[in-house]
Amino acid sequence: KMELALKGSFFDNRIIAEISLYKNYEKNLLTYLPVTQEMGYEYKLASGMDISNQGLELNLSASILKNTPLKWDLSFNASYNKNKLEKLPENQKTTVIGDHKLQVGQSVDAFWVYQNKGIYTNDSEVPVMNGKPLNINGVPFKAGDPVWTDVDGNNQINDNDRVLTGHAIPPYTG
C-alpha cells in the first residue's frame, strides 16, 4: 500500500491545492467459485483473489470572499481510479458468479454481456452445426428467442460468449 500526497496553500491560505497518488494491492481476498452440481450447491467460498487499485485525486479550494460579511468558498475535485483483477483462487483465469464475470487482467467492475443481434423470426434461422441447433445450456433456440452472438463458435451460448462492454465505475470523476 502506497500513498503520496502534496498539499500547498497560497495567498494567505485563500487557495489550497492537494494532489494524492495511491497504489494498493489486496491479497488473498475471498470470492465464490462455482462447484459441480453433485456438491448440492452452486458455489464455494475460496481465498486467493488479488486486486490492484491505483489512482490520482486532485482537490482545489479557494476563498473568493473571505473577510467580508458575505463569505464565498469554491471547491473543485477530480479523480482517476483504475482497478485490476490480478489473480483468482486455484489459478483460475475466469469465474462467473451469477451474472457477474470476473476475468484476470480486467477490472472487477466490468460488464460482460451477450451481444444481441435481434430475434429469430422462424426456426430455420437458428444456426445448425453437425446436425444440432445453436443452444444455451443444452436448450435449442427457436423462433421468438434472442439471437446471441456465438463468440467462440462452438454452437453453444455460454459464459465464454460474453463480451466486455463497459464498467460500473467511471475511471474519471469530478
Language-model regions, residue ranges each:
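Outer/extracellular conduits and scaffolds centered on Gram-negative outer-membrane beta-barrels
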Residues: 1-174
